[in-house]
Each structure stands twice: as structure tokens, then as C-alpha cells.
Amino acid sequence: MQERACFFIGHRDTGPEVAAGLADAIERHITEYGVRDFYTGHYGGFDRLAAQAVLRAKKRHPEVALTCLLPYYPAGRPLMPGFDATFYPPGMEDVPKRFAIPRANRWMIAHSGYLIACVWRPASNTQGLMEYALSRERRGLLHITNLAGQGDG
């Protein structure tokens, strides 16, 4: 993974009201921060919104790549069209299925330089991941953009 990679985390029930802010954040990451590699999951609403926004950005920036993070292998469900690649983090082979998504997400946070998030709900796996990401940001290891509060969440 590279420090110019960007990962996405958000709640599975995130709605389309964050789409405009998400598109703006992706454009900023490409044009101002030099991000070329975007990674997203494929299990929730925010994952879908992020993937769709990156695919739209790729029309203006064909050098951008979109990779789907796989917490399970095999994936277990069909992927949305448009991904350039899939990625299964090392060490996931023995992780129980119920822990696979948070573990894979944590691996990505630890190995990315940028995070675009939409996290607002306390006491959730996503909030726990956000706290881990914030600890990395405080140490200068990660740059976070949190879209929470844009639209209705």
C-alpha cells in the first residue's frame, strides 16, 4: 500500500445526501493531494456511493484506479462493475468471518495515507475504526476527511 492511497469508511445506511460532498472530496484528493489509488468495500450504502463517485471521477481522471477490498475470499457476492482490481489483505485467511470486515478495514486504515469517511453514529464498528484512524492522524500518519454532518448523515 502507498501513502497516496485513499480508503473509505462509512455506515452501511448512509444515504445519497452525502453524494455531492463525497464527489468534491474525491476531486480534491485527486487534484490537490495527488491520490491515484482508491479502495472501497462493497457491503454497504457508503461503499456503493464511494465507488460510484470514484467511477465518475475516473471519466475526468483516467489515471485513477478503483480497487475493491475483499474481507472474505472468495468474495461471497458479485462485485459492482467498474472496479480495476480486488485486494485481499495479508493475514486474513484465519480471521473468523464475523470479524473479517472490521479487520480488513483496520488493515486498510493502517496502510493508507488518506481516509474519506462518513461516520456519525457512536457505539458502532465504524466509529471504533474512526477512533483508530484519528489516533493515526494525530501522529501524522493519516489525513482524514469526515463528511458526517453533510446532508442528513
Write out the residue ranges for each language-model feature:
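Acidic/glycine-enriched connector segments
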Residues: 1-152
